[in-house]
Amino acid sequence: MMKTSLKFLWIVCLCVTGVYAQNDLPLQVDNSTIKPLQSLFSSRLQSNLEKQLMANPQWKKLIEQKKMAVGIVDLNDPNNAKFARVNGNYMMYAASLPKIAILLSAMDAIDKGELRETAEVKKDMRLMISKSDNQASTRMIDRLGYEKIEAVMTDPKYEFYDQQHGGGLWVGKRYGGGGDTNREPLKNLSHAATVTQVCRYYYLLANGQLVNEKRSKQMLNIMENPELHHKFVNTLDKIAPTARLFRKSGSWRTYHSDSILVWGNEPNRRYILVALIDDAGGEQIIRDLVKPVERALRNTLL
């Protein structure tokens, strides 16, 4: 009887390890488990997120004024991801965060033979993401063209910009320079995002679904180890110094944004977090968001 019980326990441990202890990215999961992110909405996670956010009077006011949007994806169990959001489809100016749209468009172009993957292109992609270098970003925009970026963002495969659901990711202006523009049609924004679409981007990236697994892994390598240690990263450096961080942020005037895939050594610190803020104190708000969001995630597990 004891041997049977131990054998059963060993099998259970193996199963749990297979589900929860994946350390490699992109995730190695059955494609049939990769569902549309909106279908992974969790009412319990939503309730916990709202409770944490609305407990702060300033955040509550900003959310009600549609000047603050937050999205989270719980990846502690990759086969049972959970999604929650506040002002999820409300599109805002997002400054440099939409440079992730340039990165995906470049990978799509490279994979299709439309753009040569030279040493200069590789260097510019890394500078664009890790240091948010405007000159490198503009060079990448000029290599691709606005039409290519728009085509990838509106591609039915991704639909990262969807007019029927509030818009989404968009890059229609060079960074730090003049020239022609291609603003998005709903709000005439040049650099735009919604937290839902950015969460979708990271979710598909983590699952190896952006272009293909090879290109997704390459994008993850570019986005890992950010060289700007503010916003989400400032807090995570302190509370999770060994966690792997994949991120892109942005700031311009009162607009502050950040997006991150956190991959901790322990499964209960594996999640996607996105915030868009229109407030002069947005950078500090984003720093302060991490701990309440992690509480919401932990409370969902209980």
State each model region's role:
Residues 108-126, 212-216:
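Short, well-structured active-site flanking segments
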